[in-house]
Amino acid sequence: MTATSTPRLTDILFWSAALAFLASWFLPVLPDVPGWVAFRYALAPLVPYRDAGQLAWDDSVPQVLSALTNIVFMLMFALWLAKQMFRPGMFVRIALACVLLNLYWLVRAWREKGLQDLLFGYYVWLAAFVLMLLVAVLTAFEARRTSRTPTAGTPP
């Protein structure tokens, strides 16, 4: 296999992130709660859903922001796929913010002594965001390297 036909690490990480993200929507996040239902419950402070009760603002805000990271993930996916990331450093910051916001659920479960309630789907979902963060970091390094490194006389 030649160097041009082997997939780049960023491509592998990117497609792994996309696959993990997609799978997490169908995997159980909590007992009897697949990812897509957890998304709806997280948006319940804005758009009421089933039996989701009223929450204090200090729980409502991070839940809604965490739910919105799913939309951000899809936007980052589309931008990276289209190679339209004009500011790779901003891509890193946004991906990092998403990871940190999504850690809310882990911290909340730990605080309420309910870590055993978080199931495989949550960790796959979180891993998708961590993988996207790695893609963002590698892309930013590549952009920085190619924009500041002289290429005359060096092999590709």
Predicted regions located by residue number:
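Compact integral membrane and secretory-pathway proteins
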Residues: T2-P150, P156
